[in-house]
């Protein structure tokens, strides 16, 4: 180049324009119609004029009659509502319309109890060779989830249940089916959501007197989902029977037509094995959410159980497991035990890291 000692060199450069971000968080999210509806509503709970405390005319308003927020704890306690609806929870967390800034980050993030591979610090080999505080999951404190994704389950016709009961009455074996339907606003809970079931599809199964054997995944799943979409439906949950006649000998006339009550406060409502299966199904049917960094958050998938109530009558009970259970099942941290009321935490090994798990609750005296 003919350079000599002391020569000065000058360099120039041009700024490269950054390409538009195409991350999943900035892409449009196809939410359920009910989520779009509630995101466009204020959700305030109206109150009537209080003759005892209000000191104004019918067209006035004061602190005693002004609308209250959908997450008001006093209103929920007075109406016996134990959990917030999902959209009321979003309002409580002050999650509103996203900013127009390109640097906007959705506030919700899915729980994950897996070890981060590779480590964000990049200072050591990935798990299981080594681990640090930046890539290992924190200790887990189990607690009741404040909100629920679905507040009510409704069947459009009793014949949907009768068909499953007829199979049990004829064969004395349990049955399983997927619930096909849609979601609608539920007016009994502030900003509530209900699952409306319009059909039940029973996949290939082998029924037993005390359980069901399923082939997972079922072969015609894609076809059934496609047919459901053509009808404006989707898979909203699952249902199965857990029935046993109260008098197997049929010798007591007073027990005729009654079934045993297996699930109650002194036994269990959903066994550990059923809770794990529900978590797996919920993880396979996650909820599309614009407020989540991954565009997915929790699940609206419900689990319905046909079993006997304390009166000996057949009743439908609906359940959902929390996001914590879904994350623990995804991380392969828990397993069912021989006791239906207990779930066992797996030990750590060379391929599984399990952090400390604690349980936190408030007793009847309000002590944490």
Predicted regions and their residues:
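N-terminal beta-strand/alpha-helix entry module and adjacent surface
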Residues: 7, 13-237, 241-351, 368
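Extended low-complexity, compositionally biased segments
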Residues: 360-368
């Amino acid at each position: 180049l003919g350079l000599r000692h002391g020569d000065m060199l000058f360099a120039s450069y041009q700024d490269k324009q950054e390409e538009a971000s195409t991350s999943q968080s900035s892409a449009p999210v196809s939410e359920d119609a009910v989520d779009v509806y509630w995101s466009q509503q204020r959700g305030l709970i109206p109150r009537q004029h209080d003759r005892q405390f209000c000191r104004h005319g019918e067209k006035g308003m004061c602190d005693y009659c002004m609308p209250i927020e959908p997450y008001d704890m006093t209103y929920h306690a007075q109406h016996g509502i134990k959990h917030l609806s999902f959209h009321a929870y979003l309002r409580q967390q002050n999650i509103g319309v996203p900013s127009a800034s390109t640097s906007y980050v959705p506030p919700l993030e899915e729980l994950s109890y897996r070890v981060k591979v590779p480590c964000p610090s990049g200072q050591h080999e990935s798990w299981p060779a080594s681990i640090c505080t930046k890539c290992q999951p924190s200790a887990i404190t189990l607690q009741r989830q404040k909100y629920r994704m679905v507040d009510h389950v409704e069947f459009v016709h009793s014949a949907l249940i009768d068909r499953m009961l007829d199979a049990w009455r004829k064969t004395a074996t349990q049955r399983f089916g997927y619930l096909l339907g849609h979601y609608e606003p539920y007016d009994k809970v502030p900003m509530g959501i209900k699952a409306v079931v319009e059909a039940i599809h029973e996949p290939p199964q082998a029924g037993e007197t005390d359980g069901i054997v399923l082939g997972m995944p079922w072969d015609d799943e894609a076809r059934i989902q496609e047919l459901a979409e053509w009808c404006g439906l989707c898979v909203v949950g699952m249902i199965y029977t857990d029935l046993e006649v109260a008098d197997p000998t049929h010798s007591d006339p007073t027990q005729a037509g009654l079934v045993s009550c297996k699930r109650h406060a002194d036994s269990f409502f959903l066994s550990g094995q059923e809770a794990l299966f529900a978590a797996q199904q919920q993880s396979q049917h996650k909820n599309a959410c614009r407020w989540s960094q991954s565009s997915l958050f929790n699940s609206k998938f419900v689990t319905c159980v046909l079993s006997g109530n304390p009166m000996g009558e057949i009743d439908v009970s609906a359940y959902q497991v929390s996001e914590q259970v879904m994350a623990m099942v995804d991380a392969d941290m828990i397993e069912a035990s021989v006791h239906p009321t207990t779930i066992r935490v797996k030990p750590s090994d060379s391929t599984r890291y399990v952090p400390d798990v604690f349980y936190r609750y408030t007793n009847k005296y309000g002590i944490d």
